[in-house]
């Protein structure tokens, strides 16, 4: 069951998705824009994070502009190993998304690293640690969209 959010929560969520203030006191700036106190903004964001609605607040970077590469990976993982496999994959800092899919290749994740060699090394480690050797890597050749905005 999704936690209840009110109109003020929605206004905060809409604002911080793409216009998070880069100031010394960002929550004060958000409050000023929305007619709230800094303390109320912090409390609401804390509650939204504690309830799992907000996963993280932080910067998003374009990997290619920083010299990094990215790939979409898929694994054919036995049902009884899915949780273990996902846990091991999630230990890698360059993993940004990790999903179970209803497919022969049933785990899909994205990985970013300074080089394809590093990605290949990480995938080899994952295979060794999990025993899952049916992994594919589909390196990005062109980025069409990297930003999602959810208007609430």
Question: What are the language-model segments listed below?
Answer:
Residues 1-152:
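A compositional/biophysical signature of low hydrophobicity enriched in polar/charged and small residues
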């Amino acid at each position: 069951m999704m936690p209840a959010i009110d109109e003020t929560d929605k206004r905060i969520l809409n604002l911080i998705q793409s216009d998070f203030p880069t100031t010394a006191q960002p929550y004060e700036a958000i409050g000023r824009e929305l007619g709230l106190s800094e303390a109320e903004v912090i409390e609401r964001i804390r509650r939204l994070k504690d309830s799992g609605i907000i996963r993280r607040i932080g910067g998003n970077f374009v990997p290619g502009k920083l010299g990094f590469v990215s790939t979409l990976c898929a694994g054919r993982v036995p049902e009884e190993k899915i949780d273990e496999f996902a846990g091991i994959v999630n230990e890698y800092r360059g993993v940004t998304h990790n999903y179970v899919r209803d497919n022969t290749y049933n785990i899909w994740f994205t990985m970013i690293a300074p080089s394809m060699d590093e990605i290949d090394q990480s995938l080899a480690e994952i295979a060794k640690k999990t025993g899952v050797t049916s992994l594919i890597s589909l390196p990005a050749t062109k980025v069409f969209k990297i930003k999602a905005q959810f208007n609430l």
